[in-house]
Amino acid sequence: MTALAGTDGRLRCPWALASDDYLAYHDTEWGRPVHGESALFERLCLEGFQSGLSWITILRKRDAFREAFSGFDPHKVAAFGEAEVESLMGDAGIVRNEAKIRATIGNARALLALPDGESLGALLERHRPPGKPAPQTLADVPAETTESRSLSRELRRHG
């Protein structure tokens, strides 16, 4: 990928220069491993909410999502019921898509139902693709891989 220099002279992916939010995300999070069950659960949920929307929309609402979904603590989110769904549907700070809200609650419940000794981190690690050369263009980045399809099947199997 062609890197562009920002106002500070640092080279970055072209998309990172589109906004301050993207710039901060690029410099501090993008391409870096995520550790811890709550952090992994947050990323999984936010990626789900992003479907059909731009990532910048989710980044700008991320703090509101964290508040609305109890810091993405799977134990707390799994306990959400109809009253919480109704409240979330009225929260203009998040993406108010009932199917995505219910999927997030369902995913928290599925995470808690994993067999003893299993974790979201371990499940994701089992499906990590082998190391490959860094992509040079956007066309080099596949929309899906054998590993991503396998992970998707396993996640669906767990609920």
Kindly give the residue locations of the regions a language model identified.
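HhH-family (HhH-GPD) DNA N-glycosylase catalytic core used in base-excision repair
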Residues: 1-159
